[in-house]
């Protein structure tokens, strides 16, 4: 059986966009699942729109996501060169072959000997192909006008060059966005004129935003580029996992899947034609699942730069570990550590009525004042000493369990539930703990008036 070969063919006109990353991923998963080759080809003929560093950025972000490729502009291969500007003579050869065979004609510039080569669309021809995702698609030639295949400057147009490249690189399968469906008739015309076999096409669904409109680069409510997610502290494994679910689904309901599992499970026939919703909450959830699986050292390495850039002094490794032990379960991505740090330490301490309702039956004032007395000489860098102060308070007041711990937790953190109370108090520091308990006493006093 012929070896499957799939490709991702970006233009160097910008950084790696969500939609392009998904296109690359589905071609990658297809090739790896079937034991085929994954190729990256650069379509760089639109020189005016090419961005310096655009390709390097795209390739780096694909690698960050965990993808690798068998052939490409950076790794070489037997079917190169892998950028179009290095293949101009090949396009010219076939453009003139079509010209000589009568499938194309010269289109002269007015008042000049310069000419483009325009493809002559045949009359009354029905073009059809079987799309892996959408079934049989048909087009009539009467709906397509004659079109340029080679500009007067020797640069090929997209719909011509892509056929030459896919044929010469022996591409067997092309998975791309549905916006390319309308390009397909022109490409089929070139395949037929040159007597070449079509690759198998699959046109993927559009990605839509929360308004169910097509996600575009102008949509400011959704982060569009992989680089931005990387800079926010999203994990590459989570991003890869999330992207795989934008238009594809496994047979069962399990959605947390490693790259190896995705390769094993991938089935191109489960790609959907229905619009795929870019669910930001789902992305946050998936990333949080991967964050929870990190070791403490990995979590420290992820969050440390965000804390430092936020101007937060990391006192020592033990302090950072204590902070993360309290905040890690709240994190959806790395940069969020600064938001929760600020909420924990610096926000205006507010006691919500619903929280106070949970302790209305307890002897709150007595417990809080008793604990304030017990910590007067306690070293707040010592969790064990703080825990002992809690025990001493309970023993002195003959109170234990919720009636002891909940008033102190609410008085110091503003929350009824949370992680280890001694660790939380140690992080807050004695000065802030006493300040908050005094404020709580004032609030409680006001409620009893």
From Swiss-Prot:
Reactions this protein catalyses: tRNA(Glu) + L-glutamate + ATP = L-glutamyl-tRNA(Glu) + AMP + diphosphate
Gene Ontology BP terms = glutamyl-tRNA aminoacylation
Kindly state the positions of the motif 'HIGH' region in this protein: 10-20
Q: Where in the cell is it found?
A: Cytoplasm
UniProt-listed SUPFAM superfamilies:
An anticodon-binding domain of class I aminoacyl-tRNA synthetases (SSF48163), Nucleotidylyl transferase (SSF52374)
* Single GO cellular component term: cytosol
**Keyword Protein biosynthesis in annotation:** yes
Q: Which CDD domains match?
A: GluRS_core (cd00808)
- Mention any Pfam family matching this sequence: tRNA-synt_1c
Q: Does the keyword Electron transport apply?
A: no
Indicate the secretion signal residues. none
Name the cystine pairs. Answer: none
Which Gene Ontology molecular-function terms are recorded?
ATP binding; glutamate-tRNA ligase activity; tRNA binding; zinc ion binding
The primary location reported for this protein is cytoplasm
* Enzyme Commission number: 6.1.1.17
Write the record's keywords in alphabetical order, separated by commas. Aminoacyl-tRNA synthetase, ATP-binding, Cytoplasm, Ligase, Nucleotide-binding, Protein biosynthesis
Enzyme kind, highest EC tier: ligase
Assembly state and interactors? Monomer.
Q: Please give the function described in this protein's UniProt entry.
A: Catalyzes the attachment of glutamate to tRNA(Glu) in a two-step reaction: glutamate is first activated by ATP to form Glu-AMP and then transferred to the acceptor end of tRNA(Glu).
State the similarity comment.
Belongs to the class-I aminoacyl-tRNA synthetase family. Glutamate--tRNA ligase type 1 subfamily.
NCBIfam families in alphabetical order: gltX_bact (TIGR00464)
HAMAP family (alphabetical): Glu_tRNA_synth_type1 (MF_00022)
Q: What is this protein called?
A: Glutamate--tRNA ligase
The lineage is: Bacteria, Bacillati, Mycoplasmatota, Mollicutes, Acholeplasmatales
């Amino acid at each position: 059986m012929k070896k499957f070969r799939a490709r991702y063919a970006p233009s160097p006109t910008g950084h790696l966009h969500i939609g392009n990353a998904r296109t690359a991923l589905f071609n990658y998963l297809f090739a790896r699942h079937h034991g085929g080759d994954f190729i990256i080809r650069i379509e760089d003929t639109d020189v005016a729109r090419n961005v310096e560093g655009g390709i390097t950025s795209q390739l780096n972000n694909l690698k960050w996501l965990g993808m690798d490729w068998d052939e490409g502009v950076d790794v070489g291969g037997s079917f190169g060169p892998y950028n179009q500007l290095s293949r101009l003579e090949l396009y010219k050869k076939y453009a003139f072959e079509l010209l000589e065979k009568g499938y194309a004609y010269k289109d002269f510039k007015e008042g000049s000997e310069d000419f483009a080569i325009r493809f002559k669309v045949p009359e009354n021809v029905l073009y059809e192909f079987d799309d892996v995702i959408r079934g049989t698609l048909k087009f009539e030639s009467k709906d397509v006008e004659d079109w340029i295949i080679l500009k007067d400057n020797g640069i090929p147009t997209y719909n011509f060059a892509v056929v030459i490249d896919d044929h010469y690189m022996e591409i067997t399968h092309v998975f791309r966005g549905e916006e390319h469906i309308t390009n397909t008739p022109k490409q089929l015309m070139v395949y037929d004129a040159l007597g070449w076999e079509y690759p198998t096409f699959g046109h993927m669904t559009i990605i839509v935003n929360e308004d169910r409109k097509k996600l575009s680069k102008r949509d400011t409510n959704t982060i569009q580029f992989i680089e931005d997610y990387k800079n926010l502290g999203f994990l590459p494994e989570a991003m890869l996992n999330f992207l795989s679910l934008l238009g594809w689904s496994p047979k069962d309901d399990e959605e947390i899947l490693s790259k190896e599992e995705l390769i094993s499970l991938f089935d191109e026939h489960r790609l959907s034609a229905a619009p795929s919703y870019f669910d930001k909450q789902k992305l946050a959830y998936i990333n949080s699942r991967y964050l929870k699986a990190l070791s403490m050292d990995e979590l420290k390495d992820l969050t440390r730069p965000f804390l430092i850039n936020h101007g937060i002094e990391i006192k020592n490794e033990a302090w950072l570990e204590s902070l993360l032990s309290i905040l890690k379960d709240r994190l959806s991505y790395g940069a969020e550590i600064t938001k929760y740090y600020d909420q924990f330490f610096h926000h205006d301490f507010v006691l919500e009525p619903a929280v106070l309702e949970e302790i209305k039956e307890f002897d709150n004032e007595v417990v809080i004042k008793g604990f304030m007395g017990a910590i007067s000489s306690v070293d707040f860098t010592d969790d064990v000493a703080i825990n002992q102060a809690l025990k001493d308070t309970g023993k002195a007041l003959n109170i234990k369990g919720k009636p002891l711990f909940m008033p102190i937790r609410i008085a110091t953190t503003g929350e009824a539930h949370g992680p280890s109370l001694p660790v939380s108090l140690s992080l807050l520091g004695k000065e802030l703990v006493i300040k908050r308990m005094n404020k709580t006493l004032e609030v409680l006093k006001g409620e009893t008036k």
